[in-house]
Swiss-Prot record:
Name of the molecule in the record: Phosphocarrier protein NPr
UniProt KW Cytoplasm keyword: yes
Residues covered by the HPr domain: 2-90
Keyword list, A-Z: Cytoplasm, Phosphotransferase system
Lineage: Bacteria, Pseudomonadati, Pseudomonadota, Gammaproteobacteria, Enterobacterales
Organism of origin: Proteus mirabilis (strain HI4320)
Amino acid sequence: MTQYRRVAIKNRLGMHARPAMKLFDLVNTFQSTVTLRNHEGVEAQADSVIAMLMLDSEQGSHIDIEASGCDEKEAIDAIIALFESGFDED
């Protein structure tokens, strides 16, 4: 069953290269497919840093996360924790 969650971007600079790389590295530790969607409906696969940067997500905006696969719950929980931590930037 696919997992869905919405999370706020907390870090001051939003989704730029450093958080995108952290998310990329995290997602690649799981087998599930992870898709991100911004408030405009633009989608990005989380295994592509360039695609995530195209979401143009700033502090205070929301991202919808979809994880599908054998470890989807673990993947989405870890991704939410990373977003909640502000990508350890602040």
